[in-house]
Amino acid sequence: VVMEVSSQGLMLHRVSGFVFDYGIFTNLSPDHIGPNEHASFEEYQECKSLLFRQCKEGIVNADDEHVDGIIKNHTCKLHTFSCKKDADLMAGAVGYLDEEGQIGMHFTTTGCMNVYAVVHIPGSFSVYNSLVTMLTCHLAGISDEAILRGLDKVKVRGRVELVPVSKDFTVIIDYAHNEVSTRSVLTTLKEYHPKRLICVYGGGGNRSKLRRYDM
């Protein structure tokens, strides 16, 4: 079972009866803060950190500025991934894949896996997502060959999802619903040097109105 465990779920003890084999941390930004969520960023971070007190092994992004707060008081064995510093799994030689009808990333890894990898989802965040997936699968005993085959085929609906409409332009759908994720997607797409970039977005979901102003 692969389960997304929210900060609110941890705060409200919805998963207190579980001991997870692996707990994963990718990144943290000021989000989920408001009257119906967390009172402050500090509370949000503390609730996120609870995951690493109820899992056997933790897998964390060594490049995230909040990682020390997340692993504070951890009780699990830790594994790290990074694009910038020494870690159990590191990415290097990162490049942009831009072929007819598809865009993505390619990179090499060192550490517990020494491979060349391709993922057909654009952006540096896709490299980080690939690293954490590769590291988790490696720790679970899955072969490098199977990991690379899966990575080459993976697509996520609503995450920088290419929609075939016309040869004259490219349409991409993304779930970005706050300032940080919207900025990340637009920055990513700019790296492919389009002639023009048009963004149409909404602010639904009954979330904090502050999100709309930030976006």
Label the model's feature ranges.
Residues 47, 54, 73-81, 189-192:
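P-loop/Walker A phosphate-binding loop and immediately adjacent motor/lid segment at beta-alpha junctions
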